Amino acid sequence: MPSLEPWLWGDSCSWLGMLAMLRLRLHKSNMDFTCLFCCSLAFVLYLNTLGAGFVYDDRRAILANADVSGGTPWQRSFSNDFWGTPLTDSGSHGSWRPLCVLSFRLNYLIGGGFAPWGFHLVNNLLHCVATALVVRVARTLLASVWAVLAAGALFAAHPIHTEAVAGVVGRADLAACVCYLLTYLSYLRHMRWRESGDPRQWLALGATLILAAAGLLCKETAITALLVCALFDVMRGLSGQVDKQRLRSVCIVLGALFCMAYCRLVIVPGPQTAFSSADNPIARTPSAWTRLLTFLYLPVFNLRLLLQPNVLSFDWGMDALPRVTSLWDRRNAQSACFYSVLVGVAWGSCRQLLSGSKEVTHCGVSSTFPQYHIQKVASRKSRSKRKRLANNTKYQAFEAAYHQQQQEALPCRDCNNNNSSGYVYEGSSPVAQAPAQAPHLVSSAFRGSRSSSSCSNSTNSSSSSSSSSSSSSSSSSSLSGGFQCSSKDYALEGMSPANRHACVLIMSLSFLALPFLPASNLLFYVGFVVAERLLYLPSVGFCLLVGYGVSKLMSCNQRTRNILLLSFSLLLAAMSLRTLRRNADWRDEESLYRSAIAINPPKALGNLGSVLSSQGRYEEAKQVLQEAIRFRPNMADVHFNLGILHQNQQVYPAAVECFQRAIKFRPNLAVAYLNLGISFIALGKRQQAIEILQAGSNLDGAAVRDRTAHDQARSSAYLQLGALYVEQGKLQRALAIYREALSSLPGLPQQREILYQRIGDVLGRLQQWDEAERHHRAALELQPNQVAAHLSYGITLARNSSRASEAEMWFKRALKLAPEQASVYHHYAEFLSLQSRHHESAIYHRRAAELAPNDYTLVVAAATAMRLLDRKVDAEMWYRKAVALRPGDAHAHTNLGAILHLLGRTNHAAASYKAALRLQPGDAITLGNLAKLGVTNV
C-alpha cells in the first residue's frame, strides 16, 4: 500500500502557502483601507468649508492680487511676492511662493473668477493628498498598522490644521507639505534602488531634488526636506545598513540644499523693510533677556497647541501671548522641561545609533557580506596592485568567510528571506552573529557593500519548536496590534529593535522640529509670533510620535489595548468635533473675528468693527471699534475705520477727528489723508481739503506693506484735488495736477485710464479738441472695455455740436458694454436732452431710475424728464420717491409741492411747501409758490 505521508505533507504545505498568501493580502488590504479611511475622514471633516468665503489674508493675497486675476503676465509671479508686490519694492513682504500664486491663478481661470468654493475644494483635496502621504510616511517608520492608522487619522482630524485648510492662503502650507513628504518618499526609493544597484536610482534622486525645489517655490520651510532625507540616510548607515554610495548621495543632497538656500537668500530679494511692532512685539522688546526667554517659550506654546487645540486664534500678534519678563515665570519651568526632554531623547537616540555603529564596525555583525570587496581585485588595472591586494591577509580572511557563507546559503535558497542584517533577536536584545573568519566587515557607515539577505540552514529540533511557538504567538498578537507593515514600505527592516526605536524618535523629531525652525524666531526674527498654519507640516512629526506611542501600548495586555482603543476613539471624535466647529469660525469674517475676541481683543475687535461697518450696522460697529481703541489706543487702522463709519453717517466733524488720529499714529496712511480731505470738502472747508489732499498725494510710500493700495489712495487724492480745482474754475491748475499724477504713478493702468479721462475732460472744457480726443483715445487703449472711458469720450465729443453723431455712437457702445448700468442710461439721456430729443431722453431717464431706485439724483432726473413731457402723474410718482429717499432735503419737498400745484391739489401742495420751509426757512422760491396758492401766513 503506497504511503500517503508525502501527499499529506505536500497538501499541508500548499494550504500553509495559501494561508500565508491570504494573510499577506489581508495586510495589504488593511493598509489600503487605512489610507482610504484617513483620506475620507479628512475630506468629510472639511466639507463644510466649501460654503465659506474669502476671509482675512485671502482678500489681499487673492482678491486684490493682480497676479491671481490675470492683470499681469504669469511670469510676474516669480518676481513678485505672495501678495503681488514686486520683491524689489521697499514695501515687499518678502514671502516668495510663486507656485502657490500660480495655483490661485489656475483656480481663477478654471472656476470662472473668484468663486470661493473652487478655491476651498482644492485646499480640501490637497489636505486629503497630504493625509495619504502621511500614511505612506508612517508605513516607512512604523511597523504596526495600528500606529499607521493612529498617525493618519490624527493628521486628518487635528483642529490645528483648520487655518491652513479653511483659509485659502493656507494652500502654501498644504502644497509645501505635499512636496515635503513626496521628497522624503522619493529619496527612500532612491536609497532602495541604490542599494540594489538599480540604475533608476538617478531618476529617483532627480525627482527628490525637483520635489524639494517645488516645495521651496510653495513655501520656504519646505527646503528642510533635504535635511530630513540626508539625516535618514546617515542613520541607516549608522544602523548597519552600509552602502559605499551613501556618501555620494548625501553630498549631492546637501549640495543641492546649499544651492537652493543660496538662491533663495541671495539671488531672490528679501524683505526690504522691517515688520511692524504689532506683528511681532516680542522682537521689538528692548530687553534682550525678555526676548530670549519668550522666544525659548514659543516652541513650548506651539507644542501646547498641538496637544490641546481648544484655544485657537486667527492672529497671535500684539499682546495675545504675554511676554516672559522674569526668570521666576512658571513658563520657564515648562521651557526647561521641554528642552530637557528634547535633548535627552535626541542624545539618547544618537548614542544608541553611534554605539550600534561601533558594534557593527568592531564585531562584524552583518551577515550580508559586501560583494564589491570580492570584485575589487578584478577591477584593478595594475597587475601588481591586484597581486598585492590578493596577498593581503585581511582580504584573504574576508574572502574565505564570504565563500563559506555562499556555500552555506545554497541549500536554503527557498527559505524565508527577511532581509536580516545578521541579528538574531532574543527577547529585546540583539545578538550579533557572524562567521569567525571575517575579522573586519565594515569600516564605517559610508563604506561597505549593498545590504543583501542571508538565511540559516540550521534545522535542529529546538529551533523548530521555537519557530512554531513564535509563529503562534505572532498570530495571536496580530489580532491586537501586531499587524506589521509589508517590507516593501517599511524602511527600518534589518535594524535591531534599539536602533529602530532610535530611528523612529529621531525621524519624528526631525519632521516636527526642522520645518518649524525657520519660523521659530530663534535663528532670525520673523513677522509674527505664532501662526497656526505654520504647524501644518511640523504636525506630521507629532502624529508620528503619537502613532509610535500607540504601537508601543498595543503590545501590552488585552485590557490595556481595549482601554487604548476606546481612549483614542474618543480623542479622535473630540478632535473631529473641534475641527468642525473651527471650520464654522472660518466661514466668514464676522464669525472668525468674534471667535478671537477673548484671545486677541484689539485685533479681533478692530477687524470686526470694519466688517460690521461695511454691512451698515453702524451703531454696533461704533461700539466695537471704540472698545478696540480702549484696549490699544494707538491703532491707526481702527481710528480710520471709525472715521469711515462717521463719514458714512455724515457726521463729518467726528470723522475729521478720527482721520487726524489715524494720521498721527501712522503718518504714511495715504487713505486717511484722502478721506480727511473728502470730509473737509463736505464741511465746506475747501482750502483745508486742498492742503490735506496735496500732502496725501505727495506721500512716497516708503516702508508701506501694501504698495498697490497706497498708490491707489494717492491717485484718488490727485483726482479729488483736480476735481476741486475744476469746481473752482482753475482748469490749468487741475490740468497740472492730473499730469503730475500721471508722472508719479506709472504702475497703475486703471488709475492712469481715469487720469487720461479727466485730462481729456479738462481739455474739452478748454476747447482743445485735438488734445482732448488724444487723451480719451489713450484711455481707451489702456482699458478698451472700460465703460467710463466710452462715456467720457462721448461727453467730450457731445460738446462739439459738429460731432454729435459720433458722440452718440460712443454712448451706444457703452450701452452694449454695460446694459444694466444706470449711469450709462443717465448720461445718454442727458445727451438726448441736449439734442432736444425729450421723448427718447425720458425713456432712458426712467430706465436709469429703475436700475438704481435708491439713487436720488437719477430719481429726480426721471421726475424732471416726465414733467418736461407734461406727464404730471408720472412726475408726481418719481418726486414722491425722491422725498422718501431724502426726507430732510427741502428741494425734494419743493419739487413735490410744485407738481401737486400743477395737478390742482392745492392742499397737498401747500403741505409740501410748508415742509420745505421747515427744513429751509425763508426760501424765496418756496415762499413765492405758496403765495401763488394764496397762502401768506406760514
From Swiss-Prot:
Region (Disordered): 450-480
EC number: 2.4.1.109
Stated family: Belongs to the TMTC family.
Top-level taxon: Eukaryota
Key word Nuclease present: no
Localization: Membrane; Endoplasmic reticulum
Cytoplasmic compartment spans: 1, 56-108, 161-164, 230-249, 313-510, 555-562
Function per UniProt: Transfers mannosyl residues to the hydroxyl group of serine or threonine residues.
Designated name of the protein: Protein O-mannosyl-transferase Tmtc2
GO process annotations (BP): protein O-linked mannosylation
Gene Ontology terms, MF aspect: dolichyl-phosphate-mannose-protein mannosyltransferase activity; mannosyltransferase activity
Signal sequence, renumbered to the chain: none
Gene3D superfamilies: Tetratricopeptide repeat domain (1.25.40.10)
Transmembrane segments: 2-22, 35-55, 109-129, 140-160, 165-185, 209-229, 250-270, 292-312, 511-531, 534-554, 563-580
